[in-house]
Design a protein with these regions (language model features):
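Short, conserved phosphate/pyrophosphate- and ester-handling motifs at nucleotide-, phospho-/glycolipid
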Residues: 32, 59-60, 205-208
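Post-nucleotide-binding-loop coupling segment downstream of the phosphate-binding loop, primarily
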Residues: 37-42, 47-57, 61-118
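Intrinsically disordered, charged and Pro/Gly-enriched terminal/linker segments
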Residues: 1-24
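Conserved strand-to-helix beginnings and helix N-cap segments that scaffold or border functional pockets
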Residues: 1, 87-90, 134-135
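N-terminal pre-P-loop "Q-motif" helix
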Residues: 25-39
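A conserved switch/coupling segment of P-loop NTPase cores
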Residues: 67-73, 109-175, 181-182
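Helix-loop-helix "sensor" segment of P-loop NTPases
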Residues: 97-107, 147, 156-206, 211-212
């Protein structure tokens, strides 16, 4: 019956995991292990988890690491940064999944079909400029695909009833110091870093990883 078929499909998926849109692991990923563990745990108990925080705080990197460490059979990562406000979000996500929208059919049906297999995780990265259409799409997907889990990243929450918000804070002083030294020494091995100057610089950078790496 359908239940037996679904169980069989789940076993097959576990043996042949699907991974799309994942980036190589970052060379220097410091001070975020607790966040990774908390987000993975949240995804096991909530169907929608949104990573929020200011630009450059590391939401995309954290989402990529969480996606890579997920044990669910199908994980799709879709970056929305280049999608213009007003664009068709359904078609944009379909394209990112490698499943072009049908010429005459319903693109949403194609998308929900692609995401309906048991144990699927969809990561929607950089949602802040598309909050309304993305929230609308997520609401539909959570209804249509009962086993789908969604991880979104956005500078602000999506304000959906199912949403669990994980706010990503700037790095603590020790992690910021380690990140700067690791990146600086990778760029110029052997250079001497003045501790006092570094402390002053890091205080101005407010623990924002993107600023530290630049």
């Amino acid at each position: 019956g359908p239940a037996m078929r679904a169980a069989h499909e789940a076993v097959l998926a576990a043996e042949n995991p699907v991974r799309r849109g994942l980036q190589p692991a970052p060379a220097h990923f410091l001070g975020r292990q607790a966040d990774v563990a908390e987000v993975l745990k949240a995804l096991s108990t909530h169907r929608l988890v949104t990573l929020t925080g200011p630009g450059g705080v590391g939401k995309t990197t954290l989402a990529q690491v969480v996606a890579a460490r997920s044990r669910r059979p199908a994980v799709y990562v879709v970056g929305l940064a280049e999608i213009a406000p007003g664009a068709d979000v359904v078609r944009a996500v379909l394209d990112a999944l490698g499943r072009p929208a049908p010429g005459d059919g319903d693109p949403y049906r194609s998308l929900s079909g692609a995401l309906a297999q048991p144990g699927t995780v969809l990561v929607l990265d950089n949602c802040e400029h598309l909050v309304d259409p993305v929230a609308g799409l997520i609401g539909r997907l959570l209804t249509t695909c009962p086993d789908l889990r969604i991880l979104a990243t956005s500078r602000r929450a999506l304000d959906l009833a199912a949403e669990h918000v994980h706010r990503l804070e700037p790095l603590d002083a020790a992690s910021a110091d380690r990140l700067f030294r690791a990146r600086a020494l990778a760029a110029r091995p052997g250079q001497v870093i003045d501790d006092r100057e570094l402390k002053d610089l890091l205080r101005r950078l407010d623990g924002i990883p993107l600023a530290i790496e630049l």
